[in-house]
């Protein structure tokens, strides 16, 4: 709305003066898509990348919605965008592991935010194992072979 970003989060979003803003007759706000629409977008990405998992798509959308609500309520400083969900889907097709994909795509956030986002996903998708749990299980399997 012309107020810019002084925290450095968005480069090039300077505060615009009122005379310049007055040249625009309308302002359009683009909210995030509804859960149903966003799920269609995520499913489309999955089809595009050749890895369709409807339950994972539903869980990703639910997870993003909870984070956005928390962001708007002032509880966190970061947000999960639809674009980031697309990145997670793409990473999932590469690594074939949900948590690895999520962890790789939230790695740019600070440690507390990253940990809270990952922890939240494990609550949304109760059947998923964190990378640490997967590693421990793999190590146990290797030890049991010998």
Model regions and ranges:
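C-terminal regulatory/interaction module of P-loop NTP-utilizing enzymes
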Residues: 1-146
């Amino acid at each position: 709305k012309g107020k810019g970003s002084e925290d450095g989060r968005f480069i090039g979003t300077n505060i615009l003066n009122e005379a310049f803003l007055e040249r625009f007759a309308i302002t359009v706000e683009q909210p995030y898509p509804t859960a149903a629409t966003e799920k269609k977008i995520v499913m489309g990405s999955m089809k595009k990348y050749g890895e369709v998992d409807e339950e994972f798509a539903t869980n990703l959308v639910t997870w993003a919605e909870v984070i956005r609500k928390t962001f708007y309520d002032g509880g966190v400083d970061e947000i999960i965008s639809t674009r980031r969900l697309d990145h997670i889907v793409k990473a999932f097709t590469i690594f074939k592991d949900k948590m690895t994909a999520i962890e790789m795509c939230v790695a740019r956030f600070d440690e507390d935010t990253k940990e809270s986002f990952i922890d939240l996903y494990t609550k949304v998708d109760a059947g998923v194992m964190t990378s640490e749990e997967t590693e421990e299980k793999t190590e146990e399997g290797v030890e049991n072979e010998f």
